[in-house]
Amino acid sequence: MRSIYILLLCFLCSFSVAEAQILLQQYIDTRVGTAANTTASAGTFGKHTEEYGQTLPAVLMPHGMNFWTPQTQDTENKCIAPYYYKDSKIQGFRNSHWIVGGCTQDYGSMTLMTVTGNLKTQPEQRASIFSHTNEMATPSYYSVYLDDYQARAEMTAQSRSAIFRFTYDKEGMAYLIVNPNSDYGQGSIEIDLAKKEIRGYNLVHRL
């Protein structure tokens, strides 16, 4: 009889822990640290990126190979994170290796972006206005409404891959842009029609 009670107790405990872990995600906002510091000591060590936590609203698996984040900054340069809260336009969604809290450069990254209407490929030209009120950022799910294209973008990730969904509120042409983020102009894209694959390359440059 004792073994039955113990088994029942273990089952109830495991169920409670699993339920708690799921519910706790709703309290996590991965945008924390992407805005400038406003404390009394803000700017003590500099007035540029030193004022930021240098974090990013990434979706990822624990100990994953890479992660995905909205992109508001078009560069892999040192000390510039892919996303800052102050920015008003999103350029796409980046597969990133950014080291959170640091000042080393991103590397080997690429960005996906959807546009509608006239095709625009350059990051600053294709960037869409967005509102933080229409944005949701958790470790497992990110969503934002792209005002310029009347489309909602959603993404989630595994350790080496991601799943995207783009929902359009108007009819017409829609495009998916694949952009290797090489500041040295060394990135490239290959389209294999036979295998139905798109392969991208972006050589790594680290400081």
Place the predicted regions along the sequence by residue.
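Bacterial N-terminal signal peptides
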Residues: 6-14
